[in-house]
């Protein structure tokens, strides 16, 4: 599989803006069209840096909403490897331990790679790997309520810790890094991941790129 046979689509935006939902929808619908072995999804947060050398007290202070928290260089290397026809081993990150685990997820080359993450559009080298990009333009207050429910239910967080993180890092980093990166998106999607028209437009773009 050469680079022209691998289409990379990026879905960016605030935490809990609907990125995973639209990525899941596109993945499932493209699987029906192309086959389940031809589509792959990579979550940017798998590439949070390993912090095994730090104490737990130090790890919990990590600003997950700053670009420096992510190993975008490794993500770029993995995307290029997939385009070159080589499999990659994607890291697995633990939010309870605040570091990478010893596990890896093997991903083989695909016709379509869907990236989803909050800071994808902030990195020029990463943008160069993309064939099309989307920014989920969901109101920040809605994102916060979704994030609060998710982190308490799925990530073992307390309501107080989620609220503190939001005011100290999530909102400031959104305004400093994530929202300005919207200018680099090819498609801006309002109303979250259930925007059917935006989903259809993105699918049509993917099909067009595959037909080249």
From Swiss-Prot:
Its EC number is 2.7.1.48. Keywords: ATP-binding, Cytoplasm, Kinase, Nucleotide-binding, Transferase. GO terms for biological process: CTP salvage; UMP salvage. One of its GO terms (molecular function) is cytidine kinase activity. InterPro entries: P-loop_NTPase (IPR027417), PRK/URK (IPR006083), Uridine_kinase (IPR026008), Uridine_kinase-like (IPR000764). ATP binds at residues 13-20. Pathway: Pyrimidine metabolism; CTP biosynthesis via salvage pathway; CTP from cytidine: step 1/3; Pyrimidine metabolism; UMP biosynthesis via salvage pathway; UMP from uridine: step 1/1. It is found in: Cytoplasm. It is an enzyme of class 2 (transferase). It catalyses: uridine + ATP = UMP + ADP + H(+); cytidine + ATP = CMP + ADP + H(+). It comes from the Bacteria. Pfam families: PRK. One of its GO terms (cellular component) is cytoplasm. Belongs to the uridine kinase family. This is Uridine kinase.
């Amino acid at each position: 599989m050469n680079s022209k046979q691998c289409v990379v689509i990026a879905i960016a935006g605030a935490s809990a803006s609907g990125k995973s939902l639209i990525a899941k929808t596109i993945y499932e619908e493209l699987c029906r069209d192309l086959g389940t072995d031809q589509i792959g999804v990579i979550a940017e947060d798998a590439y949070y840096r390993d912090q095994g050398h730090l104490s737990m007290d130090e790890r919990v202070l990590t600003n997950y909403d700053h670009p420096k928290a992510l190993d975008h260089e490794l993500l770029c290397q993995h995307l290029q490897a997939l385009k070159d026809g080589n499999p990659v081993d994607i890291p697995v990150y633990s939010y309870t331990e605040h570091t990478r685990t010893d596990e890896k997820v093997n991903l083989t080359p695909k016709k379509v790679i869907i990236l989803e993450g909050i800071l994808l559009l902030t990195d020029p080298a990463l943008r160069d790997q993309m064939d099309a990009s989307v920014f989920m333009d969901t109101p920040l207050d809605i994102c916060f309520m979704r994030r609060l429910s998710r982190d308490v239910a799925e990530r073992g967080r307390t309501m107080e810790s989620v609220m503190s993180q939001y005011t100290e890092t999530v909102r400031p980093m959104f305004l400093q890094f994530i929202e300005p990166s919207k200018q680099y998106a090819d498609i801006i999607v309002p109303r979250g991941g259930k925007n059917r028209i935006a989903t259809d437009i993105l699918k049509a773009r993917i099909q067009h790129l595959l037909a080249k």
